[in-house]
């Protein structure tokens, strides 16, 4: 019999197969749709502001609503993965994004747009956390850094595609068509995820849901590691689990603050620039197409950077 605990080790040591790269591709496409969904409002901000007569402050609230939802989704939705599994969480998160984008396309008051942006953000937050774990689990040690960079690059690609859709659709069908297109694309991909997305190997071996062993062997077979994999003895309680307060202990406080500050600064600058650049350039005298194109170039640069740094890592 094969030791189940060595399955992850076997994946780490083995070459990446087509099935594993398909999982990386699905994670990248989920991140691509996130980029489309998150920045759709930035690319349509001028048209929305004109239709509802919004002030800059009101527009700022709308641009922040999706980011608030992302933060809430990452903090409160993503932890459900440890209880229900990565696959159900990701399916639920993609469904939330689909509903949020669809609702945004049919609003009659701008306050409702803020509500639907929060719903979209909740889904995006759950997706961002879950896809990172799935990508890491199914990647070999040799290709993990590159696989994660491919997944991360999806966000920028989605933003670029979002800009292209915004330019093509807004002039012909109005800003609502951009959100409708995002909802349709996200909904269609949800169906593909339901068919092909596997469960986390760690979740199957530690939580051991119904038919876990059968599902584990099916995954192993698709990877090309077909054997009689057995589940390890289930551990009911982890006594050594450390509380989150340990991050703020004297030993870790300095590192915690440095990491949090750096990450906050990066995310703040990225989303501030990405969200406001098209609208500000439009006010400065550029056409809608020109302002959106500049926003697309920012995302394109991020995509290239993610791939280059992934290869260097």
Pin down the residues of each PLM region:
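Cytosolic juxtamembrane N-terminal segment immediately preceding the first transmembrane helix
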Residues: 1-36
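Extracellular/periplasmic helix-loop-helix junction of adjacent transmembrane segments
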Residues: 31, 42-72
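Extracytoplasmic gate region of multi-pass secondary transporters
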Residues: 41-42, 248-306
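Helix-breaking motifs and short loop linkers at transmembrane-helix boundaries and internal kinks
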Residues: 53, 85, 106-112, 123, ...
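Conserved MFS/SLC helix-loop-helix module at the cytosolic interface between two early adjacent transmembrane helices
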Residues: 72-110
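Helix-loop junctions at membrane interfaces in 12-TM secondary transporters
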Residues: 105-116, 171-173
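Glycine-rich segments within core transmembrane alpha-helices of 12-TM secondary carriers
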Residues: 145-171, 185-186
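Central mid-sequence intracellular linker of multi-pass
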Residues: 175-237, 247
């Amino acid at each position: 019999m094969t030791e189940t605990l060595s399955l992850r080790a076997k994946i780490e040591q083995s070459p990446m197969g087509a099935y594993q790269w398909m999982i990386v591709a699905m994670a990248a496409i989920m991140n691509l749709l996130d980029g489309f969904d998150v920045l759709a409002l930035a690319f349509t901000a001028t048209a929305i502001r004109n239709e509802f007569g919004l002030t800059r402050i009101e527009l700022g609230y709308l641009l922040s609503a999706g980011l608030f939802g992302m933060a809430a989704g990452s903090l409160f939705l993503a932890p459900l993965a440890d209880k229900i599994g990565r696959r159900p969480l990701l399916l639920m998160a993609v469904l939330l994004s689909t509903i949020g984008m669809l609702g945004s396309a049919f609003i009659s008051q701008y306050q409702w747009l803020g509500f639907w942006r929060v719903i979209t953000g909740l889904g995006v937050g759950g997706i961002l956390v879950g896809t990172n774990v799935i990508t890491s689990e199914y990647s070999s040690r040799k290709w993990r850094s590159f696989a994660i960079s491919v997944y991360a690059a999806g966000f920028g690609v989605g933003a670029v595609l979002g800009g292209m859709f915004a330019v093509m659709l807004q002039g012909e069908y109005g800003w609502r068509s951009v959100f409708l297109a995002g909802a349709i694309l996200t909904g269609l991909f949800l169906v593909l995820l339901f068919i092909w997305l596997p469960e986390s190997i760690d979740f199957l071996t530690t939580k051991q849901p119904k038919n876990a062993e059968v599902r584990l062997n099916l995954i192993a077979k698709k990877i090309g590691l077909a054997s009689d994999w057995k589940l390890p003895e289930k551990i009911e309680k982890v006594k050594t689990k450390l509380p989150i307060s340990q991050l703020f202990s004297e030993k870790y406080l300095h590192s915690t603050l440095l990491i949090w500050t750096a990450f906050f600064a990066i995310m703040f600058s990225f989303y501030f620039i990405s969200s406001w650049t098209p609208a500000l350039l439009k006010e400065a005298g550029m056409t809608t197409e020109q302002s959106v194109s500049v926003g697309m170039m920012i995302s394109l640069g991020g995509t290239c950077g993610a791939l280059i740094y992934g290869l260097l890592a």
